[in-house]
């Protein structure tokens, strides 16, 4: 699987509880633009509406060669999941504090676009600082271990 884009802000701003891999109903020009890496997941999120999940505010830049048949960069895109997964996600989102955020866009082995969405809970400012401190100390410990093993 080839990862095209990641939502680094999601890993920083949210605590990821569970992730799902979803297909996406895209136009041909959108798939070609994604293949070129012209996609941004910043500020994008997913929402459950009428038994379907939609990806909102995901920016896919227009494909140069598509001229008049090009797509709208910020249109809402339907995500494809099993009904039971959609129901499960819908129930979790109704609980207070949960959000659905895209974390990765990738191509699977068959060349299909897949979007990894995650059920997340927002982090407070002090939690973000704690995570950064822990990451730094872990990195220092690993560097020290590596240094001593030489």
Per-region residue spans from a language model:
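Flexible glycine-/small-residue-rich
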Residues: 28, 48-50, 57, 117-121
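Broad gene-expression machinery/nucleic-acid interaction feature
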Residues: 21, 41-43, 55, 76, ...
